[in-house]
């Protein structure tokens, strides 16, 4: 495994991660925690990822704005990735949204991507079986792997090992790498689904 794994350490990420670990919290609080984590993990990604350009105004004044030459796409792995997206979209309000239900693309990715396309994939728990087909589709359409970032709350080492064998340069942002997750079921979605949708 040679993936670039980034364990987000922002104080607010640590706070909301702590809230999420308390299963005694009601679903509304857990959902809020996920939304906030989606926002702050996205913030950590954007710090090094966004491309800005300098605009000259009158009176020798310049301002820095997000470059209009780049196109941003947020890929939401349904149904739980949507909870992360609630926070992430506030930071990238002009990004195109693509909804993915497991391996079936609901709202298709544009047919042509290029080096000016930046893609953020959001999922609650990393699932190699979903990510690999998506990456294959993105690369086939012209995307550059270095412009693709994965954001999730948790990922298992077995999933990371599988991804690392194919996508050694892939960059993943998460709050936790779980070494105890079962290889056949590396998701804890069942632990949350009844609480999120009440």
From Swiss-Prot:
Taxonomic superkingdom: Eukaryota
Species of the source: Pyropia yezoensis
Name of a matching Pfam family: UPRTase
Annotated localization: Plastid, Chloroplast
Name of protein: Uracil phosphoribosyltransferase homolog
Residue ranges that the Swiss-Prot or TrEMBL entry lists as coiled coil: none
Similarity comment: Belongs to the UPRTase family.
Presence of keyword Chloroplast: yes
GO CC field: chloroplast
Record InterPro entries: PRibTrfase_dom, PRTase-like
Keyword annotations: Chloroplast, Plastid
The UniProt record lists the keyword Transferase: no
């Amino acid at each position: 495994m040679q993936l670039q794994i980034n364990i987000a350490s922002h104080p607010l990420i640590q706070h909301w991660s702590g809230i999420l670990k308390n299963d005694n919290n009601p679903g509304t609080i857990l959902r809020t925690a996920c939304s906030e984590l989606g926002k702050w993990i996205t913030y950590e990604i954007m710090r090094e990822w966004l491309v800005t350009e300098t605009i000259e105004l009158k009176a020798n004044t310049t301002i820095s704005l997000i470059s209009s030459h780049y196109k941003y796409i947020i890929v939401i792995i349904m149904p739980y990735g949507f909870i992360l997206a609630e926070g992430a979209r506030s930071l990238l309000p002009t990004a195109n949204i693509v909804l993915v239900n497991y391996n079936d693309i609901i709202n298709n990715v544009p047919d042509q991507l290029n080096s000016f396309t930046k893609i953020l994939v959001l999922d609650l728990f990393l699932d190699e079986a979903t990510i690999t087909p998506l990456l294959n589709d993105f690369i086939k359409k012209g995307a550059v792997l270095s412009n693709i970032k994965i954001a999730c709350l948790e990922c298992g080492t077995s999933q990371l090992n599988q991804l690392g064998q194919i996508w050694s340069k892939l960059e993943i942002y998460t709050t936790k790498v779980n070494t105890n997750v079962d290889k056949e079921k590396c998701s804890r979605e069942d632990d949350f689904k009844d609480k999120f949708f009440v």
